[in-house]
From Swiss-Prot:
Binding site for NAD(+): 3-31, 93, 243
Organism, scientific name: Mycobacterium tuberculosis (strain ATCC 25618 / H37Rv)
Name of the gene: mmsB
Biological process terms in GO annotation: valine catabolic process
Family the entry assigns: Belongs to the HIBADH-related family.
Family matches, as Gene3D superfamilies: N-(1-d-carboxylethyl)-l-norvaline Dehydrogenase, domain 2, NAD(P)-binding Rossmann-like Domain
Protein name as it appears in the record: Probable 3-hydroxyisobutyrate dehydrogenase
Length: 294
């Protein structure tokens, strides 16, 4: 049993912390939003009035926060309250630069630190099937595994500090391109008189198969649990995809890489997010269908 401080108890943090409680760990939580805090408390998290209070008696600190700036402020706020050699795990999605900065900040205070962003969305968090992409020392990851495993379907060591975030932005750029391509295919199928079920059966049994269709199918019917069957209530929102693509484009610019498809996907999602940020990112099919009907 480990005492864990979990900072950020929102859509992802709430089910993740609940799974840690279910695995027998003691979880001390903090979130500035009262509804998030009370929801976590209902699942066995001991909620504190401030982040430093939550961290004070913890062996491990997990952060799941919205931006790199928020993560930096959080670390600055809590590091002095942490016990020596506390393990910090940041599962937020932030830039590689920010990840390396908070890693250095934690190390300067005598702490261990990993960047460990996740893939799998709210469903994966609830089902404890998240993929953790981890950057940091292998020895530190060995210490972290018993804490990550109750939340994980897969844990992948990607390299040194920042490598987890590098893997996350690359993965989500691929995902965005795939989701748009799948949406384009279903819109074209409609125009050709091909049923959605027939196209789904072909793609999932052929070379076009990917998560964007077999799990996140953008049309109602073929996958009953996909957001398309629930008014596109987000498993992974357009706002978050737009944020992640922004991080990817920043990385492309900083490294001098080229990403023509990723750049086009970023442009499509930036425009779609202006009015539909709260929908699942598979709802991008709406804008593609509108273009086809124009």
């Amino acid at each position: 049993m480990t005492t864990i401080a979990f900072l950020g108890l929102g859509n992802m943090g709430a089910p993740m912390s609940a799974n840690l409680v279910g695995a027998g760990h003691v979880v001390r939580g903090f979130d500035p939003a009262p509804t998030a805090a009370s929801g976590a408390a209902a699942h066995g998290v001991a909620v504190f009035r401030s982040a430093p209070e939550a961290v004070a008696e913890a062996d491990v600190v997990i952060t799941m926060l919205p931006t790199g700036e928020v993560v930096r402020r959080c670390y600055t706020d809590v590091l002095a309250a942490a016990r020596p050699a506390t393990l910090f795990i940041d599962s937020s999605t932030i830039s590689v630069t920010d990840a390396r900065e908070v890693h250095a900040l934690a190390e300067s205070h005598g702490m261990l630190q990993l960047d460990a962003p996740v893939s799998g969305g709210v469903k994966g968090a609830a089902a404890a099937t998240l993929a953790f992409m981890v950057g940091g020392d292998e020895s530190t990851l060995r210490r972290a595994r018993p804490v990550l495993e109750p939340m994980a379907g897969k844990i992948i060591h990607c390299g040194a500090a920042g490598a987890g975030q590098a893997a996350k932005v690359c993965n989500n750029m691929v995902l965005a391109v795939q989701q748009i391509a799948i949406a384009e295919a279903f819109v074209l199928a409609e125009k050709l008189g091909l049923s959605a079920q027939s196209l789904f059966d072909v793609i999932t049994g052929a070379t076009g198969n990917c998560w964007a269709v077999h799990t996140n199918c953008p049309v109602p019917g073929p996958v009953p649990t996909s957001p398309a069957n629930n008014d596109f209530k987000p498993g992974f929102s357009t706002a978050l995809m737009n944020k992640d693509l922004g991080l990817a484009m920043d990385a492309v610019a900083a490294t001098g890489a080229t990403a023509p498809l990723g750049s086009h996907a970023a442009d499509i999602y930036a425009k779609f997010a202006a009015d539909h940020a709260d929908l699942d990112f598979s709802a991008v099919i709406h804008t593609l269908r509108a273009r086809a009907d124009a």
